[in-house]
Amino acid sequence: MSSFTITVSFLLVLVFQFPGQTRANPVYGSVSNADLMDFKNLLDHLEDKMPLEDEAMPPQVLSEQNEEVGAPLSPLLEVPPWTGEVNPAQRDGGALGRGPWDASDRSALLKSKLRALLAAPRSLRRSSCFGGRMDRIGAQSGLGCNSFRY
């Protein structure tokens, strides 16, 4: 008796769950026929405005292009192999528009970059225990790593 009740209740749930025709994809059901016709008319209008590629080019141009496709490819320009030698313009940096690097120039550049990194706001933080906001709270309340009471 209980299996009959379960079967009947399951069938009732199915009947009330799917009252009409079932569709495989309900997204397409939300598009009306009028919308589809408007879309089709829009596509037809667009096709009328844009000429086909074959109509845009005269037949003579198309035949010339077909002949070029059938022709063998032109060989690339010959580039001499690299011998491993550097010419003076490349050695002096003339090819890149820069002069040679001196040791003093390099050290001055590195020192200026190091100063810029040390002067950055993150480097100026006095405490590594808390973030910036916690440092301000810690300084006023006496909490934190850098709390000094006077």
From Swiss-Prot:
Keywords: Cell projection, Disulfide bond, Hormone, Phosphoprotein, Secreted, Signal, Vasoactive, Vasodilator
Site entry (Cleavage), positions: 122-123, 129-130
S-S pairs: 129-145
Protein name according to UniProt: Natriuretic peptides A
Pfam (any one): ANP
GO biological process, any: regulation of blood pressure
InterPro entries: Natr_peptide (IPR000663), Natr_peptide_CS (IPR030480), Natriuretic_peptide (IPR050787), Natriuretic_peptide_atrial (IPR002407)
GO MF term set: hormone activity; hormone receptor binding
Entry GO terms, CC: cell projection; cytoplasm; extracellular space; perikaryon
Coiled coil regions, renumbered to chain: none
Propeptide: 25-122, 92-102
Gene name of the encoded protein: NPPA
Family stated for the protein in its record: Belongs to the natriuretic peptide family.
